[in-house]
């Protein structure tokens, strides 16, 4: 599950010259949800670490449009990789983490955006309103959480002002891990 929003950044439909989603910096105290334009991919298919992944604009080849907030399974279902589990015995067609292991459901979530300018003395905060279960968070080639974010739907806030770029697309990459001990479904 991934749910995040930016403080002091306002989503608007305008697009930059490069075709990137444009975040416009509003008045202090305002915030916006950044639920659109996310992409996901199984971590073991991405042949680079988060520093490299977030350092350059994303090549969306092989990436799935992702739902945020949402789960890895929600993204897989919405992209037609598995049938709707609420019908018949379709839930039996979805691989159980106990049988396939954690790597099967460890995914990267990425999002790109541009900003025109950051007013002097202003800060931009990235707020995660719940990640299930662990996450490593990167922006523009830098890891922004020193320690791996771990826990069920914990909230966490990061000042991302020093990492933002106004001269190139910003790339946010979040590596989401499922719980370490998944239990036995019996």
Model regions and ranges:
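Boundary at the C-terminal end of the N-terminal hydrophobic targeting segment
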Residues: 12, 16-19
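Accessory beta-strand-rich segments of carbohydrate-active enzymes
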Residues: 20-26, 39-45, 79-81, 85, ...
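Hydrophobic alpha-helical membrane-insertion signals
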Residues: 20-72
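Aromatic- and Gly/Pro-rich amphipathic surface segment
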Residues: 57-97
């Amino acid at each position: 599950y991934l749910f995040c929003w930016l403080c002091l950044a306002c989503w608007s439909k305008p697009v930059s010259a490069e075709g990137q989603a444009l975040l416009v910096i509003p008045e202090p105290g305002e915030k916006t949800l950044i639920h659109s334009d996310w992409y996901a991919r199984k971590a073991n298919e991405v042949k680079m670490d988060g520093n490299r992944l977030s350092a350059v604009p994303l090549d969306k080849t092989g990436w799935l449009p992702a739902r945020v907030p949402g789960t890895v399974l929600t993204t897989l279902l919405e992209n037609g990789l598995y049938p709707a589990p609420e019908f018949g015995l379709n839930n039996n067609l979805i691989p159980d983490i106990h049988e396939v292991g954690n790597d099967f459901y460890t995914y990267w979530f990425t999002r790109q955006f541009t900003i025109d300018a950051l007013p002097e003395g202003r800060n931009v905060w990235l707020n995660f309103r719940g990640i299930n279960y662990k996450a490593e968070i990167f922006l523009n080639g830098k890891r922004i959480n020193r320690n791996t974010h771990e826990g069920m739907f914990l909230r966490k806030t990061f000042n991302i002002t020093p990492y933002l770029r106004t001269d190139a697309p910003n790339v946010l990459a979040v590596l989401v891990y499922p719980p370490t001990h998944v239990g036995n479904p019996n």
